[in-house]
């Protein structure tokens, strides 16, 4: 698994604060690609920009260009900074890529340019949109004596563990699957996205909601124990390179959308409302 590589990136970002004052920008800017699963087709590209002092830049960018390093073809994309929660966030862009290989992300702000390289695979590492993902065997509340044996959430919501994935995709309801580890999340976004899901699910009784813990042996572990943690079988079966991830499946079990990292309550609501139309 690639969790350790991205753990370093997220930990680094989480230490620093966002800055709204970009008037004193120097020549040194660092672009950090946060999203990890890029493939031919539709993608969401998440990235952060840090100044020389490690502060996150949040202002509107003058230009954002993605260049294919194989063909030199360039794509001008739109992006804006998305605030996750107080002091943290990232730039988010939607882009459609027609070739695998290495790409260059080039940004410009206040006449200062910076860039980063990212890889695009022929096929997504995680389940493909428009297809049925592999069947998962997941634990549910009725099979354990204590919910805290299957989730690191300090205040677990029983309704997120009442049904297994196998049963969920058979009951003709849309299904939302969140992979996160609230107590051991290096990005600091697992808890907030889980809380967002708890807050909005009460208005969507016609959906299945599942939370799947990322690690098998999370009990009594801390972030100092990352090297000893073992990911769960569902994480392996769906090929997750990072955490958290959230997946939206229609009432036939077909994947309609997926998101890596944090998404807001409004984004969750938007995706749920789209599923209602299928």
Predicted regions, residues:
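Typically the conserved alpha-helix immediately C-terminal to a functionally engaged Cys/Sec
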Residues: 187-203
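Thiol-/selenol-based redox modules, centered on thioredoxin-like
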Residues: 134, 141-145, 256-278
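C-terminal motif of bacterial Sec signal peptides marking the signal peptidase cleavage site
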Residues: 14-17
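Sec-dependent signal peptide recognition
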Residues: 2-9
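Contiguous segments within soluble domain cores/interaction surfaces
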Residues: 21-98, 106-150
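Short active-site neighborhood of thiol/selenol oxidoreductases, capturing the structured segment around
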Residues: 146-151, 157, 165-186
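Thioredoxin-like thiol-disulfide oxidoreductase module
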Residues: 211-243, 247-255, 271-275
């Amino acid at each position: 698994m690639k969790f350790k590589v991205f753990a370093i990136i997220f930990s680094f970002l989480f230490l620093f604060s966002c800055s709204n004052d970009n008037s004193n920008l120097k020549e040194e800017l660092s672009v950090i690609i946060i999203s990890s699963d890029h493939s031919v087709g539709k993608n969401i590209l998440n990235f952060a920009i840090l100044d020389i002092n490690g502060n996150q830049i949040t202002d509107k960018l003058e230009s954002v260009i993605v260049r294919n390093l194989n063909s030199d073809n360039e794509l001008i994309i739109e992006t804006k900074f998305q605030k996750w929660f107080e002091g943290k966030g990232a730039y988010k862009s939607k882009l459609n890529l027609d070739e695998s290989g290495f790409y260059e992300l080039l940004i410009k702000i206040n006449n200062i340019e910076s860039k980063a390289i990212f890889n695009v695979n022929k096929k997504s590492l995680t389940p493909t949109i428009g297809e049925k993902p592999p069947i998962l065997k997941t634990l549910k509340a009725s099979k354990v004596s204590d919910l805290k044996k299957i989730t690191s959430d300090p205040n677990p919501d029983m309704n997120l563990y009442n049904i297994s994935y196998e049963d969920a995709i058979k009951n003709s309801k849309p299904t939302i699957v969140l992979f996160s580890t609230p107590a051991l999340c290096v990005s600091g976004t697992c808890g907030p996205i889980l809380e967002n899901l708890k807050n909005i699910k009460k208005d969507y009784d016609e959906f299945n909601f599942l939370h799947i813990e990322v690690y098998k042996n999370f009990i009594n572990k801390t972030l100092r124990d990352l090297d000893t943690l073992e990911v769960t079988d569902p994480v392996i079966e769906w090929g997750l390179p990072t955490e958290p991830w959230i997946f939206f499946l229609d009432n036939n079990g077909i994947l309609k959308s997926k998101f890596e990292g944090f998404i807001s309550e409004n984004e969750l609501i938007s995706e749920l409302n789209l599923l209602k139309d299928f």
